[in-house]
Amino acid sequence: MKEILKNLVETTTLPEDSYLDQDAEILEIFVEEIEEIFVELNPLLIDWFANPNDPEILTTIRRHFHTLKGSGRMVGAKSAGELAWAVEDSLNRVISGAIPLDMTVQRYTQTVFKIYQYKLYPIFKTVQTTDIDLRPLVLLGQHIQQNRILAPELEQLLELSTTLNAENQITGF
């Protein structure tokens, strides 16, 4: 992680994960739930970029991140749950009118989806420890929720919305 990004996130904390201590069957159910969400969320995100003002699409996307949050917390994937919460809360604020829906919100949502798809899901599926530092993405979400101007280092994370397309791709996390 770049030094300047490390400095930005030094005060951002995430709960400690405990999913490796979870019963294998419960983890398997969690992985299956993620797979189901992927099937629904992938085309929804495409539709949302084409129709950003469709409230039904927005609400459904928010609900999927709500599910990722709750399920992640339940199985002990707490940092991933917090990341999903950052998206859910951002979308809640869009729905309530507290922040505008713009490309930053959409790209952030897409970025987190791809982090789940290409980085977190393979870890959960193979029951591995994660060394991915999700704090920059959570901090990015917090800045979006507060409608703050993004530091260039945080804004650069949004590039993952279009560039992250494979598990083995290096992201800097």
Predicted regions and their residues:
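Non-catalytic helical tethers at domain boundaries
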Residues: 1-173
